[in-house]
């Protein structure tokens, strides 16, 4: 498959211009998408994918969160269970509405791209995937997790962030029992179980447990954001 990267980026930037670029959440998701595309490219090289498959992985990285922009404009939140499943909406926008052709002329990998976009946020990948399908789904899920570590570190370092909270407030919050129980099992946390901001913080820490590839853990370690998250100390005795 032939992917024109300049066209993909140009069309993605044009799409994002339809939204309020003074909104910090829109800026965040645009930057996140670009960073995830770079991360997934590194992961693809790390597992020795072909040049064509590396380009395909990169493209999935750019497009994986395209549903976030309309979600934020319509619902003013990034929490799917309070609004819309952003991954499914992104797949709908790209494929049911036909906008994938804005980005790519070649339709030969449409089904794989749709699957990877649609499944990048699920709690567990479905059974029955082919090895190739599973590989691309795991790559985008790993790349997404790795950049989420950066997002949390950089957002919490600022006084004006998309969660309207800061470290001083976070340090006093408790962790819900169900979230702590899942964390002790070293598993990812179901979003609907998260009640406090500290629950979400613990949920981010637990993403590391399910990185699929050794190169993913290596890259997360090298970037240092995950280690920064681990340095957090709570003023809430139960949480600490």
Where are these regions (language model features)?
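Catalytic-loop motifs flanking and including active-site residues across diverse enzymes
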Residues: 32, 55-58, 86, 90, ...
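Divalent metal-dependent phosphate-bond-processing catalytic cores, especially two-metal-ion Mg2+/Mn2+ enzymes
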Residues: 2-3, 25-34, 38, 42-50, ...
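Post-HEXXH active-site segment of zinc metalloproteases
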Residues: 73-88, 158-162
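Acidic/histidine metal-binding catalytic segments
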Residues: 48-59, 100-118, 132-139
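An active-site-proximal "capping" alpha-helix that borders the catalytic cofactor pocket
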Residues: 35-43, 84-99
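Active-site flanking loop/helix segments enriched in acidic
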Residues: 9-35, 67-80
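His-Asp-centered metal-binding catalytic motifs of divalent-metal-dependent phosphohydrolases/nucleases
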Residues: 54-79, 90, 112-123
């Amino acid at each position: 498959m032939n992917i024109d990267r300049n066209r993909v980026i140009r069309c993605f930037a044009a799409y994002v211009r339809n939204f309020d670029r003074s909104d910090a959440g829109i800026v965040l998701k645009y930057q996140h998408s670009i960073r995830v595309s770079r991360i997934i490219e590194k992961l693809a090289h790390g597992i020795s994918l072909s040049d064509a498959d590396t380009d395909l992985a990169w493209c999935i990285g750019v497009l994986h969160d395209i549903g976030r922009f309309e979600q934020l404009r319509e619902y003013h939140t990034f929490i799917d269970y309070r609004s819309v499943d952003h991954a499914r909406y992104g797949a709908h926008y790209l494929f049911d509405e036909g906008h994938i052709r804005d980005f790519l002329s070649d339709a030969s990998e449409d089904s794989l791209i749709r699957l990877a976009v649609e499944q990048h946020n699920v709690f567990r990948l479905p059974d029955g995937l082919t090895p190739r399908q599973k590989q691309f789904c795991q790559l985008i899920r790993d790349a997404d997790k790795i950049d989420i570590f950066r997002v949390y570190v950089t957002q919490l370092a600022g006084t004006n962030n998309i969660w309207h909270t800061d470290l001083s407030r976070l340090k006093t919050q408790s962790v819900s029992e169900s979230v702590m129980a899942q964390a002790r099992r070293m598993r990812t946390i179901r979003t609907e179980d998260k009640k406090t901001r500290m629950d979400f913080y613990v949920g981010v820490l637990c993403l590391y447990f399910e990185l699929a590839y050794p190169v993913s853990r290596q890259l997360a370690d090298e970037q240092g954001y995950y280690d920064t998250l681990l340095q957090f100390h709570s003023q809430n005795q139960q949480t600490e």
